[in-house]
């Protein structure tokens, strides 16, 4: 038994086997002892060092492998968590889109809202039937998103773009009003007297008044308080003093020109037509330059001591004009012409009711009265009935245009539309507003009277924007009574409501009211009163694809087209200072 013990001692320990890679290549059946490795080795120290290095390398390899596995495990964990969170967020968006909530009350309210909306949803026909249906769905979805996002404490009106209610360009606030600053010496008006009977509506008459003020200064003449011509289109007998404050007008401009209420008695008995002192629009070219007045009008004034301009629509050029005369033009428009208290008080009441409980409101000047529609020579989808009606109106109110259409071949209605020469219809206007992002609950004030097509066309607007109102809806019968049968005075209420609006949208940039209102908002707005000026040619190109274009594409294209009109720039040469007052004559650039 004692002789078998060495065999037990020679049995190798597990840690001395080939795990460390130091076992000699001999019999696989009987492993070497832990001392065998030194047997017959001429350099045992090198062998020990080599084994240690291999053991260290093996440890390092194990640690690297464990680290790599740990890193992969952590990355996998984060990927899993990230996937889970994204899936939850996606589900949350779906819930919000559909108006769903874990709160059963929200689900019930959403269902009730959907049922109510479906009952009210209008069936659209005509050219823009498809687009109006898409707009209705988009506005309804936006309304549900707003309502149920508010239930989750999300921001109100989050779907509206930032620049809807403010000027997108900071440069707009750098321009400040300064037309009230004077350097002119007082004028005695010794060359005679100038009278004017301005035609058109209230806004065209306003432009004529400021232009005649400049002509009076140019000719060193005294100005008689202007008179307004009775128009068979506007059918309003209002005179200057019924709309504007006469005393303020005379006093404010007294350092610039001499203003009197009537001709001296010795001149009142003159037959002005007989002596050649009556000058009509036929005799004065549009946008006549100062030289014309000095050459042709001044000699008559010096001879007869009085000149009477009849019509005087856009009969003074914007350029070239001396600096102080251009500033006088701005001073008249922005400072001297104040509405009478009766108009101001009623307009203030109108604006107060529009704002309600501090809410914003959008003013939309829908220039779509029959005179504009007939004069445009465009077609608006009314078939033969529309064509006969507009032809009849042209014969009565625009006889020269009616005669011209029979004798001369004009561009077709389709060509006029593609060139942006047709006023936007109510349908096109409401599609523009919806595409820009104004939500369904926006309060919209519509300026204008007797929209062509009547209540049927306005119904399209109210179906998409139920909070749409007019002055007739907001003011009581007794409050409107003093202005009935006075279209110019009613237009003055529209002017003030549009000028004070948080946002103003026009449908025809050639409209005098839109031009004057947009200029007023620039002059007094401090860069905080945005105006939407559609480029009708670009908008027409987009609307021509109404049968195929998708709503999201329509939105992008409309927003891009409107964004391009919002650049802040100084008045281009030859353009109206009433519409573009950002010039050194009217405003000062900080």
From Swiss-Prot:
From which organism does this entry originate?
A: Arabidopsis thaliana (Mouse-ear cress)
- Compartments, record wording: Membrane
What GO terms are given for molecular function? glycosyltransferase activity
Please state what the protein is called.
Answer: O-fucosyltransferase 2
Please provide the record's keywords in A-Z order.
Carbohydrate metabolism, Fucose metabolism, Glycoprotein, Glycosyltransferase, Membrane, Signal-anchor, Transferase, Transmembrane, Transmembrane helix
Please state what class of enzyme this protein is.
transferase
Q: InterPro entries in the record, alphabetically?
A: FucosylTrfase_pln (IPR024709), GDP-Fuc_O-FucTrfase (IPR019378), GT106_glycosyltransferase (IPR052272)
Pfam families hit by this protein: O-FucT
Q: In which pathway does it act?
A: Glycan metabolism
List the EC numbers from the record.
2.4.1.-
Q: Which residues bind substrate?
A: 365-367
Gene Ontology cellular component? membrane
Glycosylation, residue list = 125, 485, 546
Protein's GO biological process? fucose metabolic process
**Where is this protein primarily located?**
membrane
Which residue stretches does the UniProt record annotate as biased composition, category Basic and acidic residues?
A: 1-16
Q: Extract the ranges annotated as region (Disordered).
A: 1-26
Name the family the entry cites.
Belongs to the glycosyltransferase GT106 family.
Membrane-crossing ranges are 67-87
């Amino acid at each position: 038994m004692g002789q078998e013990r060495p065999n037990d001692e020679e049995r190798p320990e597990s840690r001395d086997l080939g795990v460390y890679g130091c076992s000699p290549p001999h019999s696989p059946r009987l492993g070497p002892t832990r001392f065998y490795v030194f047997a017959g080795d001429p350099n045992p120290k090198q062998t020990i060092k080599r084994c240690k290095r291999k053991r260290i390398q093996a440890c390092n390899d194990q640690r690297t492998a464990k680290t790599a596995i740990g890193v992969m495990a952590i990355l996998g964990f984060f990927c899993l968590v990230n996937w889970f969170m994204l899936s939850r967020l996606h589900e949350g968006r779906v819930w919000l889109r559909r108006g769903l909530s874990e709160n059963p009350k929200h689900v019930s309210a959403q269902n009730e809202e959907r049922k109510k909306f479906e009952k009210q949803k209008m069936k659209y026909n005509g050219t823009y039937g498809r687009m109006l249906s898409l707009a209705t769905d988009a506005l309804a979805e936006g309304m549900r998103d707003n309502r149920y996002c508010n239930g989750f404490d999300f921001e109100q009106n989050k779907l509206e773009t930032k620049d809807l209610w403010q000027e997108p360009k900071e440069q707009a606030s750098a321009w400040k009003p300064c037309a009230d600053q004077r350097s002119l010496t007082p004028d005695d008006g010794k060359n005679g007297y100038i009278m004017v009977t301005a035609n058109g509506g209230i806004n065209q008459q306003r432009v004529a008044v400021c232009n005649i003020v400049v002509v009076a200064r140019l000719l060193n003449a005294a100005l008689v308080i202007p008179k307004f011509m009775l128009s068979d289109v506007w059918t309003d007998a209002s005179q200057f003093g019924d709309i504007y404050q006469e005393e303020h007008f005379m006093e404010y401009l007294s350092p610039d020109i001499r203003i009197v209420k009537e001709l001296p008695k010795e001149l009142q008995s003159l037959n002005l037509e007989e002596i050649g002192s009556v000058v009509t629009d036929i005799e004065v070219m549009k946008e006549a330059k100062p030289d014309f007045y000095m050459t042709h009008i001044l000699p008559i004034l010096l001879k007869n001591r009085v000149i009477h301009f009849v019509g005087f629509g856009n009969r003074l050029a914007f350029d070239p004009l001396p600096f102080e005369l251009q500033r006088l033009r701005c001073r008249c428009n922005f400072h001297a012409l104040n509405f009478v208290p009766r108009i101001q008080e009623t307009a203030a009441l109108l604006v107060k009711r529009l704002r309600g409980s501090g809410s914003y409101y959008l003013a939309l000047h829908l220039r779509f009265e029959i005179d504009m529609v007939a004069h445009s020579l465009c077609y608006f989808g009314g078939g033969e009935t529309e064509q006969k009606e507009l032809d009849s109106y042209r014969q009565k109110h625009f006889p020269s245009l009616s005669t011209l259409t029979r004798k001369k071949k004009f561009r077709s209605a389709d060509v006029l539309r593609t060139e942006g020469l047709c006023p936007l219809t109510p349908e096109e206007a409401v599609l523009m507003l919806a595409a820009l992002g104004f939500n369904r609950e926006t309060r919209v004030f519509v300026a204008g009277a007797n929209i062509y097509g009547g209540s049927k066309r306005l119904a399209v607007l109210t179906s998409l924007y139920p909070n749409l109102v007019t002055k007739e809806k907001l003011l009581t019968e007794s409050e409107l009574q003093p202005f009935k049968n006075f279209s110019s005075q009613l237009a003055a209420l529209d002017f003030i409501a549009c000028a004070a609006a948080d946002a103003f949208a026009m449908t025809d940039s050639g409209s005098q009211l839109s031009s004057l209102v947009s200029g007023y908002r620039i002059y007094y707005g401090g860069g905080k009163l945005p105006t939407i000026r559609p480029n009708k040619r670009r908008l027409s190109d987009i609307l021509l694809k109404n049968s195929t274009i998708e709503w999201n594409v329509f939105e992008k294209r409309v927003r891009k087209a409107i964004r391009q009109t919002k650049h802040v720039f100084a008045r281009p040469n030859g353009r109206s200072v009433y519409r573009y007052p950002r010039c050194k004559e009217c405003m000062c650039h900080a």
